Amino acid sequence: MSDSSKAVHVIIAFLNIDSTDALKSYTTEKVSHCVKKFAHHDTEAHVVLKVEKTRQIAELSMHLSGHDFFVKEESEDLYASINMLTDSLTNQLRKHKEKVTSHH
């Protein structure tokens, strides 16, 4: 299995919200699955989960293949924000991969 040879280290910070094992596991699983499709070696992703009034915000920053990625999504549900974040990240990574491979 090629996925096991590359690790995605997801570092999660919680702001104005209690850290839960469920949120940690869900975020780590979603981000790792998304990034593993595009990473060629070990990668580190930084995620911030925070609450501002009624807004549930998920932010991600990472460096991959010589490019910095930043994604921020918000909704009224933190799990929905995480889902939107990984969808947006997948789109950014796919566009970057297409741009890089079209130059070769």
Stretches found by the model and what they are:
Residues 1-104:
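N-terminal, polar/charged subdomain of small-to-medium soluble alpha/beta proteins
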